[in-house]
Curated annotation (Swiss-Prot):
Lineage of the species this protein comes from: Bacteria, Pseudomonadati, Pseudomonadota, Alphaproteobacteria, Rickettsiales
Keywords noted in UniProt: ATP-binding, Chaperone, Nucleotide-binding, Phosphoprotein, Stress response
Pfam family, one: HSP70
Name the record gives this protein: Chaperone protein DnaK
Source organism per UniProt: Neorickettsia sennetsu (strain ATCC VR-367 / Miyayama)
Biased composition (Polar residues): 601-613
Upregulating conditions: By stress conditions e.g. heat shock.
GO molecular function ontology, one term from the record: ATP binding
Length: 636
């Protein structure tokens, strides 16, 4: 594995970023971040990033944004209703009960949508390195649960990547920030407010060790929620002025969402901005326009509750870390929303110090992931770093009366393993069903069900006699594994958690094949476009040259060129790249006669004696002017 290329990817709700070692890689459009947007067009194309974003207004129902908010979630989760209300695309219930997306007449898992973004980032890395890239470290919000982490890992597999590690976004940011700052031990807080999620992590840095002390967060709080508050305000303002509700107009809503996001960004550096959307809708009286003066003060009043929601997780993380506010040496801001002055002010007030501003909040997570990827891939220049992360949520089982019994507490350093001995509740019981949950609530049903398994084939015995040791294991990715052993017989059994949701191996394989097939289609489509562009360019230049130099070649040569142009034009309408290339080559070959004529013309022109600049026409008289120097008296 040593020396292999491994990339770091920040798969974000709003934007994503890819890096190698400590360098951020630009995408095909030349941008350092890629919008996490995927669109399905009527002609069967899949657009990713900025091209998808640009057509969102006219194709809102088939343009998928913020799919990270759906990843690893059940359709019946409370947050799904809110997401369905906020976005124009359709969310459906998959056969396994997960939330999926319907677009372009097909259904997609959120992992598939994420995979499309990952493929674009992977291709950018391959273009940059000139080599095939198959390994990556992908980041997730620290507060992602097991299902969300597994679904993110699945997205990587669908994209053709071996996911070396899933790491927490704040931890990755700390890695990038603190790489050259581990000579002395210091405590840092990473405040990560991104497009869709919020995390805060408390870490101790020193002697090459990055140890996460505690983490907390909210997987449904981010820039998308800020945008929604602005959008709702604009809808109400328009309704007051015009008596029309824009909430049922998908086209208008998409324009409003884009305007809201733009205004939010502008107000990070200015006090006031104009939101001007002409022809936003129309009624019998004619077109309607939206024009609103929007101030920073108004924005801050609209989103103050959202900003306040970040403080409670900060308090919990500090408490769990065992540190006081004054013991935090540095506060690092991550995520685009931390550019908002009101957010910076709130963080400063809580921690009692100005946040560190030496990192790019949009790129630092990808850089940290790339540093970790380089270490795991055995890069020759990899630094000797130990990364100790934690599990964000407690892991346990349902016991008598529906109580949640914790086996691994939140903020336990991972990887970790815990064992618990169980027995039977009835005489001669041959099987035990164990339900595994993740969360912090007292009752099991209030937490996230990861899955359940049945341990079968227990020898007949009075109740309470069999000794079944069940081991819960959380790996370095934060993903849960379970095994069981019958202590009485010494026989070990492999137990697989039958998760109630998530993708099966068969589904993942099918999606991997679809992604590979789609990549071939995309390659063929690109080759066709390039072939047509080359053909049209050659036709234009040949016709131009023919009009200028056609008289310099024989009529038979001219006819051959005309025929070749006609042949090429006739195949342009066909979607056959090889045929277009064949006819392009034929035109290129016969038009060489034109090139020869042009060359001869330029040669003869350069051999003609050019007129002398100092020659005078016959009869022209050159008169030398007479002048007298006049001296300035004042200069004496």
């Amino acid at each position: 594995m040593a020396g292999e290329i491994a990339i770091g990817i920040d798969l974000g709700t709003t934007n994503s970023c890819v890096a190698i070692k400590d360098k951020v890689i630009e995408n095909a459009e030349g941008a350092r971040t890629t919008p996490s947007v995927v669109a399905f067009t009527s002609d069967g194309q899949t657009l990713v990033g900025a091209p998808a974003q640009r057509q969102a207004v006219t194709n809102a129902k088939n343009t998928i944004v913020a799919s990270k908010r759906l990843i690893g979630r059940r359709f019946k989760d409370n947050v799904i209703k809110g997401i369905q209300r906020d976005y124009p695309y359709k969310i459906i219930e998959a056969k396994n009960g997960d939330a999926w997306i319907e677009a372009g007449g097909k259904s997609y898992s959120p992992s598939q949508i994420g995979a499309n973004v990952l493929i674009k980032l992977k291709e950018a890395a391959e273009t940059y390195t000139g080599k095939k890239v198959t390994k990556a470290v992908i980041t997730v919000p620290a507060y992602f649960d097991d299902a969300q982490r597994q679904a993110t890992k699945d997205a990587g597999r669908i994209a053709g990547l071996e996911v070396l590690r899933i790491i927490n976004e704040p931890t990755a940011a700390a890695l990038a920030y603190g790489l050259d700052k581990t000579a002395t031990t210091k405590n840092i807080a990473v405040f990560d407010l991104g497009g869709g999620t919020f995390d805060v992590s408390i870490l101790e840095l020193g002697d090459g060790v990055f140890e996460v002390k505690a983490t907390n967060g909210d997987t449904h709080l981010g820039g998308e929620d800020f945008d929604r508050m602005i959008l709702n305000f604009l809808v109400e303002e328009f309704k007051k002025e015009n008596g029309m509700d824009l909430k049922n107009d998908p086209l208008a809503l998409q324009r409003l969402k884009e305007a809201a996001e733009k205004a939010k960004k502008e107000l990070s550096s200015t006090q006031e901005t104009d939101i001007n959307l002409p022809y936003i809708t129309a009624d019998a009286a004619g077109p309607k326009h939206l024009n609103v003066k929007f101030t920073r003060a108004k924005l801050e009043s609209l989103v103050s509750d959202l900003i306040d929601r970040t403080i409670e997780p900060c308090k919990k993380a500090l408490k769990d870390s065992g540190l006081k506010r004054e013991e935090i040496n540095e506060v690092v801001l991550v995520g685009g929303m931390t550019r908002m002055p009101a957010v910076v002010k709130k963080v400063t007030e809580f921690f009692g110090k100005e946040p560190h501003k030496g990192v790019n909040p949009d790129e630092v997570v990808a850089i940290g992931a790339a540093i970790q990827a380089n270490i795991l891939a055995g890069g020759s220049d990899a630094q000797d770093i130990v990364l100790l992360d934690v599990t964000p949520l407690s892991l346990g089982i349902e016991t008598l009366g529906g109580v949640f019994t914790k086996l691994i507490d939140r903020n336990t350093t991972i990887p970790t393993k815990r064992s618990q001995t169980f027995s039977t509740a009835e005489d001669n019981q041959s099987a035990v069903t164990i339900r595994v949950f993740q969360g912090e609530r007292q009752m099991a049903s209030d937490n996230k069900l990861l899955g359940q398994f049945s341990l079968e084939g227990i020898p007949p015995a009075p109740r309470g006699m069999p000794q079944i040791e069940v081991t819960f294991d959380i790996d370095a990715n934060g993903i849960v594994h379970v095994s069981a052993k019958d202590k009485g017989t010494g026989k070990e059994q492999t137990v697989k958690i039958q998760a109630s949701g998530g993708l099966t191996e068969e589904e993942i394989k099918k999606m991997v094949d679809e992604a590979a097939s789609k990549a071939d289609e995309d390659k063929k489509r690109r080759e066709l476009v390039e072939a047509k562009n080359s053909a049209e360019s050659l036709i234009h230049s040949t016709e131009k040259s023919l009009s200028e130099y056609g008289s310099k070649i024989s009529s038979s040569d001219k006819q051959s060129i005309d025929d070749a142009i006609s042949d090429l034009k006739s195949v342009l309408a066909k979607d056959d790249a090889s045929l277009i290339k064949e006819k392009t080559d034929a035109l290129s070959k016969v038009s060489m006669k034109l090139g020869e004529a042009m060359y001869k013309e330029s040669q003869s022109a350069s051999n003609d004696p050019s007129p002398k600049n100092d020659s005078t026409e016959e009869g022209e008289r050159v008169v030398d002017p007479e002048y007298e120097e006049v001296k300035d008296e004042d200069s004496k």
